[in-house]
Design a protein with these regions (language model features):
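Conserved catalytic core of the tyrosine transesterase superfamily
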Residues: 1-287
């Protein structure tokens, strides 16, 4: 089996499992790099030792972030299991331990400051969708005109995480910011298949996540509360925290975030965890 034939089979297997386009792209990248490293004529001759050599090479010679390295591990392990039918153990495809604590998440008040101070209509619209609707960065850059329903004020998100379709609501304020940006860009409701955030380099394509992330990071550096580990994804933390501060129930926040688990949603909520001086008397009705 040639490398190209095996990649085609790999993508068919990923499609059958309804994995997202982002996962497809990442897995394709890492398996392709694995082939460049091993240069196999027949991929069926590849072994787990080859995979381990490749992953060791990544660890020893490249300074990839832990999460990026773990994506590479997942990609190679999935390829071996789905295409070569070789099942390695967790010890053979060892992933790095990643801290799940964001040290300096963007607070709701900071997110509002970012929105109010932003002079770039494109970035302001993206921030409004990230903080005001809780949308992921990849959901924002792939948003099309047809996905925005002005009458009922909701957005349809196709190919969301897990290759699912979900809907999110948006406020009048978010609508005004988005409409202002579209007016400046000349984006109209007639161009239904057009991207809201088009690529500046490739006609007909959408802006990449890296471009939006880079623009946001540069903007953050002009703000007084900037810290290096703050990212565009922090706006989702601010979205969840802001809803929790307004007493929106956790299951509702979970649905709006598009999470399968309430535990995942709870991780996004950053509220003071101070214990009360006295335990409330739960045996007496509140007046």
């Amino acid at each position: 089996m040639t490398p190209n034939e095996s990649l085609d089979r790999f993508h068919r297997q990923l499609n059958a499992r309804h994995l997202s386009n982002t996962t497809h792209s990442n897995y394709h990248l890492w398996v392709s790099r694995f082939f460049e490293y091993c240069r196999p004529d027949d991929v069926s001759e590849l072994t787990i030792d080859d995979a381990q050599d490749f992953l060791l090479n990544l660890s020893e010679n490249y300074d990839y972030a832990d999460r990026t390295y773990n994506v590479a591990v997942d990609a190679i392990r999935s390829f071996f299991e789905l295409v070569l039918h070789i099942h390695g153990s967790g010890k053979e495809f060892l992933k790095r331990k990643v801290s799940v604590v964001q040290k300096n998440p963007i607070t709701p008040d900071q997110a509002l400051t970012l929105l109010e101070s932003c002079q770039d209509p494109m970035l302001k619209a993206a921030i409004a969708l990230g903080f005001g609707c809780g949308m992921r960065i990849e959901e924002i850059v792939t948003l099309k005109v047809v996905n925005i329903h002005k009458g009922s004020r909701f957005i349809t998100i196709e190919n969301s995480k897990g290759n699912k379709t979900r809907t999110v609501k948006y406020s009048l304020s978010a609508m005004e910011i988005l409409q202002n940006y579209c007016r400046i860009r000349g984006i109209t409701s007639a161009s239904k298949d057009s991207y809201i955030f088009p690529s500046e380099k490739k006609s007909g394509d959408h802006m990449s996540c890296s471009v939006l992330s880079y623009t946001f990071r540069n903007y953050l550096q002009t703000i007084s509360f900037y810290l290096p580990d703050q990212t565009f994804h922090g706006l989702r933390h601010a979205f969840a925290t802001s809803l929790a501060n307004r007493n929106v129930p956790l299951p509702v926040i979970q649905k709006l975030m598009g999470h399968q688990s309430a535990a995942t949603t709870a991780f996004y909520i950053h509220t003071p965890q101070e214990e009360p001086d006295e335990l409330p008397d739960l045996l007496v009705r509140e007046k």
